[in-house]
Amino acid sequence: MDKRPAVIFAAIIFLLLLSGCMQKTDAAAAGETAKATFTVTGYQGKIAEKAVEAEKGANAFELMKKNISVKYTLYSFGPLITEIEGTKPEGSDYWALYVNGKYAEKGIADYILDEDLEIEWKIEKSPY
């Protein structure tokens, strides 16, 4: 009796079981989380502070919209924040974005939560 079909069948079953284990590992990795801490500083000092735990890969702007009252205008380059927690900058002042203590080099919509982030919005004077 030829045992080849039984060996091939056993190998296929083994590979299917092995691929099932790999999927569980990927699913566990997808459940990893990171923390985004949003701090908002206006003319009179701190307006709001909120820490949010979310899955890695979450968009910082989407998290902000869900957890802090924010108004914005959407442009081709991304959202321009106009009001946070009911506070609007006066005159030519603007909302400045700092991420992990440094002035942001990109917009809030371009930050992805792949590690813990400290996100701070401050009203600053325009240099113009």
Spans of features found by a protein language model:
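Ubiquitin-like/PB1-type beta-grasp interaction modules and other compact soluble beta-rich domains
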Residues: 2-128
